[in-house]
């Protein structure tokens, strides 16, 4: 027999249906190594769930102008504004972890916005992708973003905005690769779209790579702006596929 995922989870965890739905919607529930995407997904009645505890953000740098935070996956960037009471300088997708910057005064905000507009902000990401990446790749492909009530969707299109990404192979484990991605532009879902279009979709990226995992393995590793460099350490989840990741990438 089958039943809706949230009802099965409610029984397993001895919680209400609404609490079970909230956990699934937050991306914290998996079964058989894959994240449960829909609370109403029909599953076998003997399905065993794993429920992740929501990680907390950590401060990686702070001075009188800026606060740099290592955002965990499954948390919206807007939540950081509520927690720390400062405004956002950049945003990450809910599923993406890593460096998020918050400004403390308008002077720094204006200076930072100018850096972003002039493409002077250096950003690098770490990702685990499908397939074996054996050499550097460069993508100079415009991205068009379509925004709907259900969220944003991006695609490569001649009608899109310029988008440039550089991909560097770091190591391989099985049929998966750990890569570093440097970007100059910051288009919506840029890295995910460029990698998926090249056949190296990010593991856990359900939208563009049709990949299900406990999380999306994309992490904003380092951001450099106005002479300051912020680095967010990788979480232990990146060791999941047999990668022995050094402290400094």
Where are these regions (language model features)?
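Short, well-structured beta-strand segments within conserved domains
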Residues: 47, 189-193
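RNA pseudouridine synthases
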Residues: 1-153, 158-164, 171-172, 238-246
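Pseudouridine synthases involved in rRNA/tRNA modification
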Residues: 1-23, 192-249
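Polynucleotide-recognition surfaces of large bacterial nucleic-acid defense/processing enzymes
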Residues: 182
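Long C-terminal interaction/binding lobes of large macromolecular proteins
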Residues: 167, 179
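Short beta-strand-loop-beta element adjacent to the nucleotide/active-site pocket used for signaling
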Residues: 175-176
